[in-house]
Amino acid sequence: SAEVAGAIIDGASLTFDVLQTVLKALGDVSRKIAVGIDNEPGMTWTAMNTYFRSGTSDVILPHTVPHSKALLYDGQKNRGPVTTGVVGVIAYAMSDGNTLAVLFSIPFDYNLYSNWWNVKVYKGHRRADQAMYEELYYDFSPFRGDNGWHTKSIGYGLKGRGFMNSSGKAILQIHVNKV
């Protein structure tokens, strides 16, 4: 099955069932996420990097995402008895010369924190790092993982439509398209 983290699938095939399959493959981890990002605006995306504020992934970020395809990725808290969640930013260079950035945040302690996500286009090519994480988390109106769909302009004539649940076993589905 192509429904594994690190795979590229047809954008039209990006469903919650696919993301649940990716999530199950991570096994019994208390904080984990399956990410699916659909490339609909007619560009090619090339992987730059993932910055993890906490947590990790055993999967290599899919390198090239053609138009009408979706990437699958995952993340999990660090192994062992550590009190961390999985928080990070994915960066893709887009063929228009800009960078697509996607934030995901699955906390360890739900008494203090909630799930959050964000998507934004940065001018030029920029790798994900701590500064990008802080901008996406604190400054650019992230969405709470509230089991609902949200849409916003993400810059440079593009919009992002996404969904994240509120669970520690999270799914994040984002569709990037022209405005």
UniProtKB/Swiss-Prot annotation:
Annotated binding of an N-(acyl)-sphingosylphosphocholine 2, by residue: 53-54, 85, 113
Coarse class of the protein's main subcellular location: secreted
UniProt-annotated binding residues for an N-(acyl)-sphingosylphosphocholine 4: 133, 138
Residues the record lists as binding an N-(acyl)-sphingosylphosphocholine 3: 116, 137
Record flagged with keyword Ion transport: yes
GO BP term (any one): cytolysis in another organism
Membrane-spanning residues: none
Keyword set, alphabetical order: Cytolysis, Ion transport, Lipid-binding, Membrane, Nematocyst, Secreted, Target cell membrane, Target membrane, Toxin, Transmembrane, Transport
Binding site for an N-(acyl)-sphingosylphosphocholine 1: 31, 79, 168
Region annotation N-terminal alpha-helix that contributes to the pore: where it falls in the sequence: 1-29
Site (Part of the hydrophobic cavity (in subunit A) that receives Val-60 from the adjacent subunit (B)): 16, 149, 163
Family: Belongs to the actinoporin family. Sea anemone subfamily.
Subunit structure and binding partners: Octamer or nonamer in membranes. Monomer in the soluble state.
Domain notes: Composed of a long N-terminal alpha-helix and a core region rich in beta-sheet structures. Before the pore formation, the alpha-helix binds the lipid membrane, partitions into the lipid-water interface and stabilizes the monomeric molecule on the membrane. Finally, it traverses the bilayer, thus forming the transmembrane pore.
The protein's name in its UniProt record: DELTA-actitoxin-Afr1c
Species per Swiss-Prot/TrEMBL record: Actinia fragacea
